[in-house]
UniProtKB/Swiss-Prot annotation:
Gene: lspA
Protein topology in the membrane: Multi-pass membrane protein
Protein's name in the database: Lipoprotein signal peptidase
Presence of keyword Mitochondrion: no
Transmembrane segments: 8-28, 61-81, 91-111, 128-148
Signal peptide: none
Organism: Anoxybacillus flavithermus (strain DSM 21510 / WK1)
Reactions the enzyme catalyzes: Release of signal peptides from bacterial membrane prolipoproteins. Hydrolyzes -Xaa-Yaa-Zaa-|-(S,diacylglyceryl)Cys-, in which Xaa is hydrophobic (preferably Leu), and Yaa (Ala or Ser) and Zaa (Gly or Ala) have small, neutral side chains
Length: 168
Protein backbone atom coordinates (compact mmCIF):
# COMPACT_ATOMS: atom_id res chain seq x y z
CA UNK A 1 0.00 0.00 0.00
CA UNK A 2 2.78 2.44 0.92
CA UNK A 3 4.60 1.82 -2.39
CA UNK A 4 1.40 2.50 -4.36
CA UNK A 5 0.91 5.77 -2.46
CA UNK A 6 4.48 6.84 -3.20
CA UNK A 7 4.03 6.00 -6.88
CA UNK A 8 1.12 8.47 -7.06
CA UNK A 9 3.52 11.31 -6.23
CA UNK A 10 5.92 10.19 -8.96
CA UNK A 11 2.96 9.93 -11.36
CA UNK A 12 1.99 13.50 -10.47
CA UNK A 13 5.56 14.63 -11.21
CA UNK A 14 5.46 12.75 -14.54
CA UNK A 15 2.16 14.43 -15.52
CA UNK A 16 3.61 17.86 -14.66
CA UNK A 17 6.66 17.10 -16.83
CA UNK A 18 4.48 15.94 -19.74
CA UNK A 19 2.24 19.01 -19.64
CA UNK A 20 5.22 21.31 -19.16
CA UNK A 21 7.23 19.87 -22.04
CA UNK A 22 4.20 19.67 -24.35
CA UNK A 23 3.25 23.32 -23.78
CA UNK A 24 6.85 24.42 -24.27
CA UNK A 25 7.07 22.40 -27.48
CA UNK A 26 3.92 24.13 -28.74
CA UNK A 27 5.38 27.56 -27.98
CA UNK A 28 8.72 26.78 -29.67
CA UNK A 29 7.02 25.16 -32.67
CA UNK A 30 4.23 27.65 -33.35
CA UNK A 31 5.32 31.01 -31.94
CA UNK A 32 8.09 33.42 -32.84
CA UNK A 33 10.36 34.49 -29.99
CA UNK A 34 8.80 37.61 -28.47
CA UNK A 35 5.39 36.97 -30.03
CA UNK A 36 2.50 37.62 -27.65
CA UNK A 37 -1.06 36.33 -28.01
CA UNK A 38 -3.75 37.88 -25.78
CA UNK A 39 -5.84 35.30 -23.91
CA UNK A 40 -7.62 37.82 -21.65
CA UNK A 41 -6.80 41.37 -22.78
CA UNK A 42 -4.73 43.33 -20.21
CA UNK A 43 -4.61 40.30 -17.88
CA UNK A 44 -3.24 37.12 -19.48
CA UNK A 45 -1.05 36.61 -22.54
CA UNK A 46 0.86 33.75 -24.09
CA UNK A 47 4.26 35.29 -24.79
CA UNK A 48 7.17 33.34 -26.26
CA UNK A 49 10.18 34.06 -24.07
CA UNK A 50 13.49 32.34 -23.22
CA UNK A 51 15.35 32.45 -19.93
CA UNK A 52 18.96 31.36 -19.43
CA UNK A 53 18.83 32.08 -15.70
CA UNK A 54 16.60 31.48 -12.71
CA UNK A 55 13.37 33.17 -11.68
CA UNK A 56 13.11 36.75 -12.91
CA UNK A 57 16.18 36.21 -15.09
CA UNK A 58 18.66 36.03 -12.21
CA UNK A 59 22.02 34.27 -12.65
CA UNK A 60 21.94 34.27 -16.45
CA UNK A 61 24.06 31.56 -18.07
CA UNK A 62 25.10 29.77 -14.86
CA UNK A 63 24.30 26.31 -16.28
CA UNK A 64 26.55 24.21 -14.06
CA UNK A 65 25.22 25.91 -10.96
CA UNK A 66 21.65 25.11 -12.04
CA UNK A 67 22.57 21.53 -12.91
CA UNK A 68 24.15 21.01 -9.50
CA UNK A 69 21.34 22.69 -7.55
CA UNK A 70 18.67 20.77 -9.48
CA UNK A 71 20.37 17.41 -8.91
CA UNK A 72 20.67 18.10 -5.17
CA UNK A 73 17.03 19.25 -4.97
CA UNK A 74 15.74 16.26 -6.96
CA UNK A 75 17.68 13.79 -4.81
CA UNK A 76 16.36 15.50 -1.67
CA UNK A 77 12.77 15.39 -2.92
CA UNK A 78 13.06 11.69 -3.85
CA UNK A 79 14.45 10.90 -0.38
CA UNK A 80 11.56 12.77 1.25
CA UNK A 81 9.00 11.01 -0.98
CA UNK A 82 10.43 7.61 -0.06
CA UNK A 83 10.10 8.44 3.65
CA UNK A 84 6.52 9.73 3.50
CA UNK A 85 3.90 8.27 5.77
CA UNK A 86 0.41 7.50 4.40
CA UNK A 87 -0.99 10.39 6.47
CA UNK A 88 1.29 12.91 4.73
CA UNK A 89 -0.70 13.09 1.49
CA UNK A 90 -0.62 16.90 1.14
CA UNK A 91 3.14 16.90 1.68
CA UNK A 92 3.46 14.15 -0.95
CA UNK A 93 1.44 16.17 -3.45
CA UNK A 94 3.65 19.19 -2.74
CA UNK A 95 6.79 17.12 -3.31
CA UNK A 96 5.38 15.59 -6.51
CA UNK A 97 4.63 19.05 -7.92
CA UNK A 98 8.07 20.31 -6.93
CA UNK A 99 9.77 17.27 -8.46
CA UNK A 100 7.87 17.67 -11.73
CA UNK A 101 8.61 21.39 -11.87
CA UNK A 102 12.31 20.97 -11.11
CA UNK A 103 12.72 18.23 -13.72
CA UNK A 104 10.64 20.11 -16.32
CA UNK A 105 12.98 23.10 -16.27
CA UNK A 106 16.03 20.81 -15.93
CA UNK A 107 15.07 19.10 -19.21
CA UNK A 108 15.00 22.53 -20.90
CA UNK A 109 18.40 23.48 -19.51
CA UNK A 110 19.96 20.22 -20.68
CA UNK A 111 18.47 20.07 -24.18
CA UNK A 112 17.81 23.74 -25.05
CA UNK A 113 20.41 25.48 -22.85
CA UNK A 114 17.56 27.82 -21.85
CA UNK A 115 14.10 27.59 -20.29
CA UNK A 116 11.02 28.27 -22.40
CA UNK A 117 8.59 30.62 -20.64
CA UNK A 118 5.24 31.72 -22.00
CA UNK A 119 2.63 32.56 -19.35
CA UNK A 120 2.55 36.34 -19.06
CA UNK A 121 0.18 37.96 -16.58
CA UNK A 122 -0.60 41.49 -15.53
CA UNK A 123 -1.73 41.90 -11.95
CA UNK A 124 -3.04 45.39 -11.16
CA UNK A 125 -1.08 46.79 -14.15
CA UNK A 126 2.11 45.05 -12.94
CA UNK A 127 3.73 42.90 -15.62
CA UNK A 128 4.53 39.74 -13.68
CA UNK A 129 7.68 37.90 -14.92
CA UNK A 130 6.88 35.39 -17.66
CA UNK A 131 6.77 31.79 -16.42
CA UNK A 132 5.83 28.25 -17.48
CA UNK A 133 4.01 25.15 -16.21
CA UNK A 134 7.10 23.88 -14.34
CA UNK A 135 7.44 27.21 -12.52
CA UNK A 136 3.75 27.13 -11.58
CA UNK A 137 4.05 23.55 -10.29
CA UNK A 138 7.11 24.49 -8.21
CA UNK A 139 5.35 27.52 -6.75
CA UNK A 140 2.17 25.59 -5.92
CA UNK A 141 4.27 22.78 -4.45
CA UNK A 142 6.17 25.16 -2.18
CA UNK A 143 2.90 26.84 -1.12
CA UNK A 144 1.36 23.44 -0.29
CA UNK A 145 4.47 22.50 1.66
CA UNK A 146 4.10 25.67 3.77
CA UNK A 147 0.40 24.96 4.30
CA UNK A 148 1.17 21.38 5.33
CA UNK A 149 3.91 22.50 7.72
CA UNK A 150 1.68 25.19 9.22
CA UNK A 151 -1.29 22.84 9.75
CA UNK A 152 0.95 20.12 11.18
CA UNK A 153 2.47 22.62 13.60
CA UNK A 154 -1.00 23.80 14.66
CA UNK A 155 -2.11 20.20 15.23
CA UNK A 156 1.04 19.41 17.21
CA UNK A 157 0.62 22.54 19.29
CA UNK A 158 -3.05 21.74 19.86
CA UNK A 159 -2.20 18.21 21.00
CA UNK A 160 0.53 19.43 23.35
CA UNK A 161 -1.78 22.14 24.75
CA UNK A 162 -4.47 19.50 25.32
CA UNK A 163 -2.01 17.18 27.05
CA UNK A 164 -0.82 19.99 29.33
CA UNK A 165 -4.29 21.18 30.38
CA UNK A 166 -5.57 20.30 33.81
CA UNK A 167 -9.09 19.16 34.60
CA UNK A 168 -10.83 19.72 37.96
Amino acid sequence: MLWRGVMLYYLLAFVVILIDQWTKWLVVRYMELGESIPIIENVLYMTSHRNRGAAWGMLQGQFWLFYLITIVVVVGIVIYIQRLQPTQRLFGIALGLMLGGALGNFIDRIFRKEVVDFVHTYIFNYSFPIFNVADAALTIGVALMFIYTWTEEKQRKGMSDGANSTHD
